[in-house]
Amino acid sequence: MIDISSLAKRMVEQSKNPQKKIQPHNSLHKSDFKFLYVIGKGGFGRVWKIQSKKTKTKYALKEMSKVRIIDKKSEKSINSEREFLSKLNHPFIVNMHYAFQDKDNLYLVMDLLNGGDLRFHISRYRKFSEEQTRFFIANMIYALEYIHENNVIHRDIKPENLVLEDKGYCRITDFGIAKENMPDNS
């Protein structure tokens, strides 16, 4: 039997980078990217599969309408999500690479994951083997441990916010209702 937790731990150790801080990029514009197609829609806009024209790297781009954000009184939530993602970088979360805006929209350029969310896989397969379940749980534990070490509480762990990558690793996404862990949050 494969030791799932040591496999996940080894991936974390191999990919440890100095923590990167992502700052909003005033010099970036959506014209720096080739928009390939829409991969999702949400309350504020669309999620695109894009490619950097400079590096050819593919990403997911969250395009959010400023008007919709204001109409739904969600400025604080969107700003918090961007702020949390700008300080987090881990192999088991969906990482943000860039953040920028134009007069109409806010943009978050994030890791592109093609494996679908866990809700889709649960509805498709109905159940997972014990080994696969342990593997997903180990991924989530490492991600949550890292998130908590950085004083962030996710507050919305559910199958739709757990996305699989091509190699089968599970990553946490959607920090929209996350909160900073303050001493009085205990």
Predicted regions and their residues:
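Intrinsically disordered, low-complexity regulatory segments that flank or precede the catalytic domain
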Residues: M1-N26
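Eukaryotic serine/threonine protein kinase catalytic domain
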Residues: P24-S186
